[in-house]
C-alpha cells in the first residue's frame, strides 16, 4: 500500500527565488490553491522540504481523495469525472476502484494528464486559513507538513 501525499500550494510566485518557482513547476503547482497527489518517496519529500514555505502537505485518506476526484477533478474536455468516463478511458470499473488502485500504486494520478486536467484547482478555504501563511504549521501557521490534517483543509477547499 502506497502512502499518497496531498500537496497544496498556498503562496504565490512573487518574490520567490527562481529555484523555488522551478521546483514548484516540477511539482505542477503553478498557481495558488492548486493541488496534486504524489506517492511518498524520498525525491518528493526532498522537493517538498525545499519549497515548504510555499506549500502544505500531508497524507490524504481515501474518503477525501474520492471526494476530490468527484467534485474537483475534470476530464481533458473540462467535464466532471464520472464512473462511465473512468470505465471508458482507464478501463477501471468505477471511481471507488480508481481510488483503490491509486493507493495500491497501480496507477499514478500525476501520470494521467492525457485524460484529466491537472493540477486539480481548489477554492480558497471556507472560513479562511486558521493561521498565517507566513508561519509553519507547527507554530500556529499554515505552511509545511501537517499530516492527516490535510484532509480537513482539502474538504474546506472543495
Curated annotation (Swiss-Prot):
Pfam families referenced in this protein's UniProt entry, alphabetically: Ribosomal_L30
Family: Belongs to the universal ribosomal protein uL30 family.
Subunit structure comment from the entry: Part of the 50S ribosomal subunit.
A molecular function GO annotation: RNA binding
Gene that encodes the chain: rpl30
Listed GO biological process terms: maturation of LSU-rRNA from tricistronic rRNA transcript (SSU-rRNA, 5.8S rRNA, LSU-rRNA); translation
Organism phylogeny: Archaea, Thermoproteota, Thermoprotei, Sulfolobales, Sulfolobaceae
Domain of life per record: Archaea
Organism the protein comes from: Saccharolobus islandicus (strain Y.G.57.14 / Yellowstone #1) (Sulfolobus islandicus)
Annotated InterPro entries: Ribo_uL30_ferredoxin-like_sf, Ribosomal_uL30, Ribosomal_uL30_arc, Ribosomal_uL30_euk_arc, Ribosomal_uL30_ferredoxin-like
Protein name, entry field: Large ribosomal subunit protein uL30
GO cellular component, one term: cytosolic large ribosomal subunit
UniProtKB keywords: Ribonucleoprotein, Ribosomal protein
HAMAP family named in the record: Ribosomal_uL30_A
Keyword Ribosomal protein recorded: yes
KW Plastid (keyword) present: no
Amino acid at each position: 500500500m502506497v502512502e499518497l501525499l496531498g500537496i497544496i500550494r498556498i503562496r504565490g510566485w512573487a518574490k520567490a527565488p527562481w529555484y523555488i518557482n522551478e521546483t514548484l513547476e516540477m511539482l505542477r503547482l503553478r498557481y495558488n490553491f492548486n493541488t496534486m497527489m504524489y506517492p511518498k518517496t524520498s525525491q518528493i519529500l526532498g522537493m517538498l522540504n525545499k519549497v515548504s514555505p510555499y506549500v502544505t502537505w500531508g497524507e490524504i485518506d481515501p474518503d477525501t481523495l474520492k471526494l476530490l476526484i468527484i467534485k474537483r477533478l475534470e476530464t481533458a474536455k473540462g467535464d466532471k469525472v464520472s464512473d462511465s468516463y473512468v470505465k471508458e478511458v482507464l478501463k477501471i470499473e468505477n471511481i471507488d476502484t480508481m481510488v483503490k488502485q491509486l493507493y495500491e500504486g497501480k496507477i499514478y494520478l500525476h501520470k494521467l494528464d492525457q485524460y484529466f486536467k491537472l493540477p486539480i484547482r481548489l477554492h480558497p478555504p471556507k472560513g479562511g486559513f486558521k493561521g498565517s501563511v507566513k508561519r509553519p504549521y507547527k507554530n500556529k501557521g499554515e505552511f509545511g507538513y501537517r499530516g492527516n490534517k490535510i484532509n480537513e483543509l482539502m474538504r474546506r477547499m472543495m
